[in-house]
Amino acid sequence: MQELNESIYDHPKYYDLVFGADCAAETKFILGCAEQYSSRPAKRFFEPACGTGRLLYSLARRGHDVDGLDLNPKAIEFCNARFKRHEMPYRAFVADMSDFRLRKKTDVAFNTINSFRHLPTEAAARGHFESMAGAVRVGGLYLLGVHLTPTKATPSEGESWSARRGHLTVNTHMWTNSRDPKRRVERFGIRFDIHRPSGSVRIVDELVLRSYTMRQMKALIDHSGLWEIVETFDFGYDLSDPITVDAASEDVVYVLRRRQNKVTGK
């Protein structure tokens, strides 16, 4: 099998398939949170690190206005091409999620699959929350999914899954390469094994992510003083089953509400 050492984000067709399995559940969860926790009906939705825009497209099909950004031009091109094919307006653009501005404030923002952890430093992470505060209206929501590092349980070391669309099959494997708690850097190997009638190819990449314990994440959210945690869920996206985040928690979706006034002294 031919092996390519390339970024998985430079292959949006395969990425879209691999991470598209939960799209219906995620869309239902996003809309459910908007209905349950937003201060008024949500019409505009925004996704930082939108990738191929699968969730943006799912929401747009339901009649919502959407915006998205991503650092990878190939992902944005793929995202906007899908909207264009379906003769729908698109506004996904290339930008850094730690420093950006939206032309119009959104009602609900979401980043559900751990992309936030690509920001390498505390300064970048704080910049993200400041930028998000500028993007989300007062009383609006930010749904942030993060894979935390547990401090009272053994962290997960890997996972595998498969996805298929027509004659295309992608088998995905992830594994831990290293963890450095002091530097807060975790390295994960990821592999796409791609099988088509014309042949097979393997794409191998390494993801370098900043780590967060429960306490570190709470401190980061509190730092800007512009967000309050109104509820937390796991990656099962079950609105009837919120969780309490503790030292054993790993997969967490924070439902954050934009405050009207900045809270200081935390």
Language-model regions, residue ranges each:
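Conserved SAM-binding loop of SAM-dependent methyltransferases across substrates and taxa
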Residues: 52-64
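A short glycine-rich, Lys/Arg-flanked "PGG" loop and its adjoining helix->strand segment in the class I
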Residues: 126-138
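Conserved SAM-binding strand-loop segment of SAM-dependent methyltransferases
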Residues: 85-97
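Conserved SAM/SAH-binding beta-strand->alpha-helix loop
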Residues: 72-74
